[in-house]
């Protein structure tokens, strides 16, 4: 999702500068994948290294932090607006429950609003879009297909 910064996506967990034993500075950035096995992790890591190198930091280490796992709740408001402007439906709040989960025989989450016309009448086309973190929907009002970033 090139319209988002790693910070706006919520995967950038932290950046710190440490001094090595030889007296040099190294930037250590921590990122969390949106999904286990996220195919964008290598690209995100490479982008971070290149951006920090371009900013004058020749030594960069990128660490993967898996705990706590990423949540779509971590997407910033600026990131959600960027998703909508790019024609994607931003996720709603992630479900956070503990204990027994009731059996649901209908849809497991409410259908998202269309990012183009705003209609609440949309239909799930496919559980998976171009990546596992997105689903495909069609608006029954304007008939446009769109991707929805899943609530995790």
Regions from the PLM with identified roles:
Residues 1-152:
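Domain-level signature for proteins that mediate thiol-based redox and metal-cofactor handling
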């Amino acid at each position: 999702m090139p319209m988002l910064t790693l910070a706006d996506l919520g995967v950038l967990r932290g950046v710190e500068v440490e001094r090595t034993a030889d007296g040099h500075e190294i930037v250590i950035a921590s990122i969390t994948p949106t999904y286990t096995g996220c195919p964008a992790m290598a690209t995100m890591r490479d982008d971070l290294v290149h951006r920090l190198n371009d900013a004058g930091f020749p030594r960069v280490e990128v660490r993967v932090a898996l705990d706590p796992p990423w949540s779509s709740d971590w997407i910033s408001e600026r990131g959600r607006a960027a998703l909508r402007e790019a024609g994607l439906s931003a996720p709603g709040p992630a479900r956070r429950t503990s204990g027994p989960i009731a059996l649901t025989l209908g849809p497991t989450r409410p259908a998202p609003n269309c990012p183009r016309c705003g209609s609440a009448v949309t239909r799930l086309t496919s559980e998976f879009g171009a990546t596992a973190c997105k689903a495909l929907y069609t608006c029954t009002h304007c008939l446009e297909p769109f991707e929805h970033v899943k609530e995790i």
